[in-house]
Amino acid sequence: MNDKQSVSLSFDNVSHSYGAVNVLQSLSLEVQNGEVLVLVGPSGCGKTTILNLLSGHIRPTQGRVNRTGNIRTVYQHDGLFPWLTVGENIDMGLRSLGNQPQRETEKKDLIELIHLQGFENHYPHQLSGGMRQRVELARALAGQSDILLMDEPFSALDYQTRLRMRLELVRILKQRPRTIVFVTHDIEEAAQLADRVLVLSSRPATICRELHVNEQRPRDLTGAAVIETMKTILIELGLQQ
């Protein structure tokens, strides 16, 4: 058993149903502080339900969810306010700081972190998809957040932009470490980002394989660790012999 002081999130024998539909079955897991845990599995297996349970948006039908730290969620489609500028959207995540000079300093630091200097007064519709997701990420990092729950945050972007966003996320985490639970259908993304991958079964979801990716980030997509992780995920999902 891991030291409880090092665990940010955990499920203890969690099951969840929507009416007669059993989505999760007796699921137990732990997320370590500072870890990037990636969830992959068949469509509709309950990955987003797991994030909603971890965030506290829903309560489990059975079992216990434990949380230590402040949680922010990043979704597939950014939740930026279209009537606010980049700077104003980021400032919305800083309200907990209270002190205006401190907020201004933190906002400036975050804009520099996501490499959007000069775009502070632009509105979301004036930005590319990748730029909007960077603003969304900055807002999630703002304030006192310790944990990021990321629900397919790059899936709506084109392939080249997804690759760039993965590298951006790795760079940002080196400067601002966070605990991350990341849901994706993209096995390449999972192998490139994860410290640990949980491969989930079809509904009701159980953990059918746990994979540790013991290679520093950023990772070469043609490197042995990434290729072997991708191959194992494909086999577990029944997509490769």
Question: Whereabouts are the PLM-identified features?
Answer:
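Conserved signature/switch motifs of ABC ATPase nucleotide-binding domains
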Residues: 122-125, 143
